[in-house]
Amino acid sequence: MSAREEWRKRFGCRNPRIVCVGLNYKAHAGESGGELPKAPLLFGKFSNTLVGDGDSIVLPPNIGHVDAEAELAVVIGERGSIFGYTCANDVSARDAQFGDGQWFRGKGFDTFCPVGSRIVPAAELDPSDLRIQQRLNGEALQDSRTSDLIFDVPTLVAYVSQVIALESGDLILTGTPEGVGVFREPKVALQSGDVVEIEIEGIGVLRNEVTA
């Protein structure tokens, strides 16, 4: 059973909606050269991007630079409530993302949203100050804390709820901290055979191998 099928079965949803938030860590907004956003910057991924822990991230042919983003994911439960939290990876094809001037294509390829298998119930975890890391082949690229978020989890859920009625199984990816490959010097891109790990304190590790 695929990760999408397991997700649908678990939450009774047809296709989960994946709402993402851009530039939501202060240091990441700084490394990108942009100003701090005055409101959450929302974009989305379709369910075709969803894969699970241990699944492969597949690099599209002739797409250029691709890198990973460590993210805390909010899992929505019944009636728009917060069911829990898990690890996620907002995989991004930067040449497409920046070349298009918008983010949908660069972040929308198949397998570009790995999500962890462990969901920690909301009542058991305070998301306001958790260590969040990305490791590539064992080397730490991102190492920050969710206390650097510009807009916290309650603010994001309330803001997104003004746009759509959130349903069970929907996901909100809350943004990524500084250290992503495209803004490093020299740049760090994913290559076939790489192993990406996203680890969040109190949740666990999401691990995926990269293939072409």
PLM region spans:
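Non-heme Fe(II) oxygenase catalytic core, chiefly the N-lobe of the double-stranded beta-helix
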Residues: 55-83, 87-94
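Short beta-strand-to-turn element immediately C-terminal to the catalytic PLP-Schiff-base lysine
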Residues: 21, 31, 44, 53, ...
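Short secondary-structure boundary segments
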Residues: 23, 89, 176
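Residue-level marker of positions within ordered structural domains that often coincide
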Residues: 24, 48, 79, 120, ...
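Structural motif
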Residues: 16-19, 40-42, 48-49, 56, ...
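Catalytic-pocket segment enriched in acidic/His residues
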Residues: 2-12, 28, 34, 86, ...
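Extended, compositionally biased flexible segments
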Residues: 1-69
